[in-house]
Regions:
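Short alpha-helical transmembrane segments in multi-pass integral membrane proteins
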Residues: 1-22, 76-142, 188-246, 302-367, ...
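N-terminal transmembrane alpha-helices
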Residues: 7-38, 42-43, 59-71, 75, ...
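Transmembrane helical elements of multi-pass membrane transporters/channels
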Residues: 17-36, 136, 170, 203-207, ...
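Residue-level hotspots within the lipid-embedded alpha helices of multi-pass solute transporters
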Residues: 26-30, 63, 103, 107, ...
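Helix-terminus/linker motif at the lipid-water interface of multi-pass membrane proteins
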Residues: 27, 31-49, 117-124, 180-191, ...
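Small-residue hotspots at the loop-to-helix junctions and early N-terminal turns
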Residues: 45-56, 130, 134, 197, ...
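Small-residue-rich hydrophobic transmembrane alpha-helices
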Residues: 48-111, 144-163, 263, 276-340, ...
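Short runs within selected transmembrane alpha-helices of multi-pass transporters and secretion channels
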Residues: 69, 73, 137-156, 163-171, ...
Length: 452
């Protein structure tokens, strides 16, 4: 046993060193979502339901956009492992161009969705709340894309603390802004849900400017900036980023869609079910963000080792990652299960919503290990740049399995919210197993010199 531990000890330590700042940044986002839900929920249950609908629609496109930026981590990480500093700067120029195009495309899609929002079957009384909040979120979308473009650069060169501090500061600013704008403090009018949206928009804009400013004006990045200044937007780099980024974006987008599109089904069950669904989404993000924070460190370390062609270290990094993810799954899940009857009361005073939350925590508990498994090995595949299988695996797991089962359990069998959530363990566990299988297959091909 001690021999096994010594084999992975260095990888545990390095993954923890890289992963903890990412996890803290992710938890900062969770705390922000928690605070948003808490503050909006205590202001109005109707506003909480409207926020649930809009946030789930935007979560889908934001996760898609972030997934697209994850191509940068793989490319930058491999170049960093090869100590090609100037080349990283060149790649970042093409990465910024590619992600700006993605921001424009996603914004156009959301405008079309806004124009048809009344056709999506949501309660009529929520539409006056949904529309202005939707538009405010739309304005901030490009800034999310730009922030994450440069965040993946700092993660790829193993400087994960930069994004952590910016995220923490931005989230503190957002929560303070919520307090001022939702409830009308410091002489400002009480804006409710619109105030929450404005606070989020302002913090996202500020974080993007700070992140980009650090890249261009920090002395420790001057060699990378030199590569940016001397380089051009190259078709080959633009294409490579797109070819890697689209599968990653689709994989993450389809997973998120299983949750976001389930909100449409939950909306059919009424405002209280939708409010409970929003509370559960906030809770579920705890495990996901912790797992994905550590798994992102797995992707960074693996990409560095891929640049060095140290395939034994690649394997041990992925294995050490799953050990740590499963440990984190236990540490996060048990307290939530113990407190399941009181968690809903933190968000709302509505007795029916609290009861639905306590019941829905059961399927949430079931899928934690499947979620950890898929986070770890999806990122292991990302680190090896073996991303094409991610598309069909995610499609089968979430669109062929999870969403239809959600409709079967929730609508046909009439288990409603709990039924919809009982579909998630099937999709997440299936995806985790398939990612593991195709990670192993892809790495064997790389080791043998074959193309993947």
């Amino acid at each position: 046993m001690s021999y096994q531990f010594s084999k992975y000890e260095t990888h545990y330590r390095n993954l923890t060193y890289l992963g903890v700042p990412i996890i803290i940044g992710q938890l900062g986002n969770l705390i922000l979502n928690f605070a948003d839900t808490l503050m909006i929920g205590h202001h109005s249950t109707e506003e909480l339901a409207a926020a649930a609908f809009v946030n789930n629609m935007f979560t889908l496109v934001i996760i898609f956009a972030i997934g697209f930026t994850y191509a940068i981590t793989a490319l930058v990480g491999i170049l960093y492992g090869q100590d090609k500093t100037h080349r990283i700067g060149e790649v970042m120029k093409s990465a910024a161009a590619a992600n700006t195009c993605m921001a424009i495309l996603l914004s156009a899609i959301m405008i079309v969705l806004y124009l048809n929002i009344h056709r999506l079957g949501q309660p009529e009384e929520l539409l006056p709340l949904i529309r202005p909040y939707f538009l405010i979120q739309l304005v901030s979308l490009p800034f999310v894309c730009w922030f994450n473009t440069f965040r993946q650069f700092t993660d790829g060169i193993t400087d994960t603390k930069v994004a952590m501090w910016i995220l923490v500061a931005g989230n503190v600013m957002n929560i303070f802004g919520n307090w001022i704008l939702i409830y009308g403090h410091l002489g400002l009018p009480e804006m409710g849900l619109v105030g929450a949206g404005l606070s989020t928009m302002i913090s996202r804009i500020v974080m993007a400017f700070i992140m980009v400013g650090i890249f261009f004006f920090s002395k420790k990045y001057k060699e990378y900036k030199k590569g940016w200044s001397l380089g051009q937007v190259k078709y080959a780099d633009f294409k490579q980023i797109t070819v890697l980024g689209i599968p990653l974006a689709l994989q993450m987008g389809m997973e998120t869609a299983a949750f976001s599109l389930s909100s449409l089904m939950v909306g059919w069950f009424g405002t209280e079910s939708l409010a409970a669904h929003q509370v559960m989404l906030t809770i579920s993000q705890l495990g996901y963000m912790i797992y994905y924070g550590l798994a992102a460190a797995v992707a960074v370390r693996i990409s560095n080792f891929m640049g060095q062609r140290d395939y034994l270290a690649v394997r041990r990094t992925a294995t050490a990652g799953i050990h740590l993810v499963f440990l984190l799954a236990i540490l996060t899940s048990v307290p939530i299960f113990i407190c399941r009857h009181i968690i809903g009361g933190l968000f709302t005073d509505n007795v029916n919503v609290i009861s639905m939350v306590s019941m829905t925590i059961i399927p949430f508990m079931i899928y934690q290990f499947g979620d950890g498994l898929q986070c770890n090995y999806a990122n292991a595949m990302r680190g090896t740049a073996n991303v094409r299988p991610l598309i069909w695996i995610a499609f089968v797991s979430f669109f062929i399995v999870s969403l239809p089962l959600g409709y079967l359990f929730g609508v046909v069998m009439n288990y409603q919210l709990v039924g919809v959530w009982f579909a998630f363990p099937f999709g997440l566990t299936l995806s985790g197993v398939l990612y593991y299988i195709y990670y192993q297959k892809g790495l064997k091909k790389i080791e043998s010199g074959a193309k993947i």
